Amino acid sequence: MHGAPTSKWDGKDLWKKYDYRALGVIGEPYFDVDFGQVFYLTDTGRCWDGYKVSVRDKIPRYQDEWVAAGLVYHATDDIIRAAEEGSLPHRIMITTHPQRWTDKRVEWVKEIFTQTIKNVVKRILIWITS
């Protein structure tokens, strides 16, 4: 729950005012997972190494450590290969955006075009705010 990358609001900020546990929410991954013990993978940017273009969907504190350890996967096949070889960490949190997945060619082309444009905009936002 992080919100749109171009929004000035971060959805996680909601929990600065409200206690999600008091509302029956069991846990909030960005707050309750120890990423020193759990590797984080997300398909943001239509790839598994989308942290480069992600404004909010990332764990900056640990990303450099994961990259230095070789935990960089671009395609799903890379993740599968690492799992088969036994080099994938045993503890992983995976965040996906299934609304972007399709096996329909026209929808897939539309999604890749749109996401490519969004990634360019996100790179610019990251550069401006760095």
Give residue spans per PLM region.
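Terminal accessory/targeting
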Residues: 1-130
